[in-house]
Amino acid sequence: MNIYVWLFAIIALSFSALVGLRLSFKKGTANVLVGESIITVVAGTLIVVISQKYNLAFADTIALAIFICGVVGAFAFCKVIGGDNEKAKQPN
């Protein structure tokens, strides 16, 4: 992997992580879930990029586990915090 491509990927992932953190600390459940999803994707992608640089064989499995746990955690959070759906307006 070219050093400039690697540095660009690291810098882009760093900015994405900062955006995800900023979004996570805003009010509202939706903002927190989107921010958490961004951080999960950034962490998994960062692990894959670093594994390409340093030739780590097990990093792809760890990144896949992070992606899956992030999605499952977001759905579990929605289910627990979601509340009662009977009070929601139903479309006609």
UniProtKB/Swiss-Prot annotation:
Signal sequence residues: none
Membrane topology: Multi-pass membrane protein
UniProt-recorded name of the protein: Uncharacterized protein MJ1223
Disulfide bonds: none
Organism: Methanocaldococcus jannaschii (strain ATCC 43067 / DSM 2661 / JAL-1 / JCM 10045 / NBRC 100440)
Main subcellular location: membrane
Record-annotated membrane-spanning stretches: 1-21, 30-50, 62-82
Keywords associated with the record: Cell membrane, Membrane, Transmembrane, Transmembrane helix
